[in-house]
From Swiss-Prot:
GO terms for cellular component: plasma membrane. This is Probable potassium transport system protein Kup. HAMAP family: Kup. Belongs to the HAK/KUP transporter (TC 2.A.72) family. Keywords: Cell membrane, Ion transport, Membrane, Potassium, Potassium transport, Symport, Transmembrane, Transmembrane helix, Transport. It is found in: Cell membrane. Pfam families: K_trans, K_trans_C.
């Protein structure tokens, strides 16, 4: 029995799929107009030259870093229709010939994942807080204390994280239509404002971006760290390609690009007419219609919640990939949808993320301070994605695409260097957060390798020879016993100890091996009953994003077990790194809990290992 699932390619995606992509992918980019120009012009004087130059830079940033890098280059790389950092790693590693290159890009992939996690802590905080601060534009609420706004933002964030366990399958159907209304609102309000100052349309000309740097010098370079806020969330275009499809995302981006850019144009036009504003989006909307401002504010808060939800779902997906590819230890995963393969919930991650977001809100307190800390991890992730693209196109000898990727990556690195200046203004936070999963991955993977070497698994031929002899002479226990191993070629020490040292051999002994494939989705299994008398092998192969029900597969294979054995390690060490590794192993759920094996049938076999 086998099944393989890949995203379908459509020449003309349906309107439903495009609307769904608009809701699930572009929340972060779609809410960036709330704060990008407001923060930039706290940093720069709002002169006509700076306003024209800033809008010009925003246009070319969206065009180069989002349109070219992700919708044009990155999306053509995956042959299976999947996206994300680990997918790029899976594409590149088989193409590399030197082990040193494999090690470097594996480390880069780990760094990229860690930076995305660091970025995703700040995203919900800045999105929700910046929207809530719009309350001050309502007459009578101009002097509301910031503490109350922070409290409201924390309540919204807490409600969002409390809601995760229930799953978002039902409400996610409304995300697309709501975000389409949001984008239409951005476009219409921006277009009306542009009509009063049509000269702002000239900002598309890159000469204004060049003049911006000439006039501002080094200050102009550091301004890129604020300009890049318009492109936050670009990685989601590529990462979400697997379950939404390339074409719906590309078509949706055409609509979103126009809507978002017109909002920037409208805000810039409003700034040309009113240079003393604090937040051009809020004040522009209020000036257009005071009556509609409160509905707009409510819509904006909902849009930021949807954007935050997409980020949280993305984190669950990244962590799940890292678990199945053995980069992170096993964490209990709940499946919140019977239909959508990507709808998962990881309780530990959810509450750690919730605590981190609330701490960020309490530490920074103002959206402009959060903006000053935001962007370093974003540009770092983009630079890593660009490096992978260059290497893949080079290995495939697609030199034209490689050249384009090289130019784009140089732009990414330029933005990254500009955001380094944010480290002293709070940018260190995303690095500190990213350092936590990065350190855990390095320690865990190194520990697993050391553990594997110390455990000294038994080879296939030696195991079969000893098993045949033992099965003939030993007294058989009634029923069927299950054992878990990576493969029959390397049989874990706990199996040989159980069968040969402790002489525990059942009438039927089934060794189950789980093989994680390089492809994201699809699974197959094969049950070989004829290895030796009383010995069978169930091999299960599945993609690193595929969700499997292990006990259901065992039942489908016709196996009715009496006992399930699995290996446990007692690590003895004086090395501080291995002590941390041992603590990680103890704190994380066991193999039994992860795969939801029936606890009353399970027996753990402890092996003492010195590292």
């Amino acid at each position: 029995m086998s099944r393989r699932t890949i995203s379908k390619t459509m020449e003309h995606p349906s309107k439903t799929s495009i609307i769904k992509a608009a809701g699930l992918v572009f929340g972060d980019i779609g809410t960036s107009p709330i704060y990008t120009l407001a923060v930039l012009f706290l940093f720069l004087p709002p002169t006509p030259e700076n306003i024209m130059g800033a809008v010009s830079l925003i246009f070319w940033t969206l065009l180069i870093m989002v349109t070219v890098q992700y919708t044009f280059l990155a999306m053509r790389l995956s042959e299976t229709g999947e996206g994300g950092t680990l997918v790029l790693k899976g594409i590149l590693i088989p193409l590399l010939k030197k082990p040193k290159g494999v090690a470097v890009f594996t480390l880069l992939a780990t760094l990229g994942i860690s930076l995305m996690i660091g970025e995703c802590v700040i995203t919900p905080a800045i999105s929700i807080l910046s929207a809530v601060e719009g309350v001050r534009q309502i007459p009578g609420f101009e002097l509301i204390a910031q503490d109350w706004l922070i409290f409201l933002a924390i309540l919204i964030a807490l409600g969002l994280f409390l809601f995760q366990k229930r799953g978002t399958e039902g409400v996610s159907r409304t995300f697309g239509p709501v975000m389409v209304i949001w984008f239409l609102t951005l476009f219409i309000s921006g277009a009306i404002s542009v009509a009063f100052s049509p000269e702002i349309l000239l900002a598309i000309n890159p000469i204004y971006a060049v003049e911006f740097f000439i006039h501002n010098g080094l200050l102009g370079f550091f301004s890129l760290s604020m300009i890049v806020l318009c492109a936050t969330g670009a990685e989601a275009l590529f990462a979400d390609m697997g379950h939404l499809g390339r074409e719906p995302i590309q078509y949706a981006w055409g609509f979103v690009f126009i809507a978002v850019f017109f909002s920037y144009l409208g805000q810039a036009a409003y700034l040309l007419r009113n240079t003393d504003v604090i937040n051009p989006l809020f004040e522009m909307i209020f000036s257009l219609s005071q009556i509609l401002y409160i509905p707009f504010l409510l819509l904006m808060i909902i849009a930021t919640i949807i954007a935050s939800q997409a980020v949280i779902s993305g984190i669950f997906s990244i962590i799940y990939q890292a678990i199945t590819t053995h980069l992170l230890p096993m964490l209990p995963v709940d499946y919140t949808s019977d239909e959508l393969r990507t709808q998962i919930y990881i309780n530990t991650v959810n509450w750690l993320l919730c605590i981190a977001v609330i701490c960020v809100l309490l530490i920074f307190q103002y959206s402009e301070r959060l903006a000053s800390a935001y962007g370093l991890a974003v540009t770092g992730t983009m630079s890593i994605t660009g490096s992978f693209m260059i290497a893949i196109f080079l290995q495939r000898r697609k030199y034209l695409y490689m050249g384009i990727a090289l130019i784009v990556t140089l732009v990414d690195i330029t933005y990254f260097l500009s955001t380094v200046s944010k480290i002293t203004h709070g940018g260190y936070l995303s690095l500190v957060i990213a350092a936590i999963p990065f350190t855990i991955v390095i320690i865990y993977t190194s520990g697993q390798r050391a553990l594997y070497r110390s455990m000294k698994p038994m080879g296939h031929d030696q195991f079969i020879k000893k098993y045949t002899r033992a099965y003939k002479t030993a007294r058989h226990l009634r029923g069927t016993a299950l054992f878990f191993a990576r493969s029959l070629d390397q049989v874990p020490a706990y199996i040989s100890r159980t069968m040969f040292n402790n002489e525990i051999i059942y009438e039927e002994n089934v060794i189950i091996s789980l093989d994680i494939k390089d492809e994201p989705y699809g699974f197959s299994w094969h049950f070989d009953k004829s290895i030796e008398p009383g010995l069978s092998h169930l091999s299960i192969s599945y993609g690193y994003m595929q969700i499997i029900d292990l006990m259901r597969i065992i039942r489908d294979a016709g196996i009715e077990e009496k006992t399930i054995f699995y290996g446990m390690e007692e690590i003895v060490t004086r090395n501080i790194i291995w002590k941390i590794f041992s603590a990680i192993k103890r704190l994380c759920p066991s193999f039994v809990q992860y795969y939801r094996l029936p606890s009353h049938k399970v027996h753990g076999v402890i092996t003492r290992v010195e590292l």
